[in-house]
Regions:
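Alpha-helical transmembrane segments and adjacent TM-loop junctions that form the membrane-embedded core
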Residues: 1-85
Length: 85
């Protein structure tokens, strides 16, 4: 679906603007009535990031709503335990 692909790319851009090491996966869009669209996804948070998960959620959701006021983010945060070399 073109709309899902476009919106996923926009959300990926938002996440990368916060920290280039962050990634998202399992992205879905589900309409919730006429005035709301849930953006449901997982975000991988790198170790040592200066933001709490609540702060990250606020930043991501605020920027998503600027793209489209009907967007409502539902984010599951995963910790990234991989070791950078």
């Amino acid at each position: 679906n073109e709309a899902v692909t476009k919106t996923r790319a926009e959300i990926e851009s938002i996440v990368k603007s916060i920290d280039s090491r962050m990634t998202i996966h399992d992205f879905r869009m589900t309409p919730s009535g006429e005035k709301r669209t849930n953006l449901i996804f997982d975000a991988v948070v790198p170790a040592g990031l200066a933001f709490t998960k609540a702060e990250l959620e606020g930043l991501i959701c605020e920027k998503a709503v600027r793209l489209n006021p009907t967007y409502n983010c539902v984010i599951t945060f995963d910790d990234d335990f991989t070791v950078e070399e």
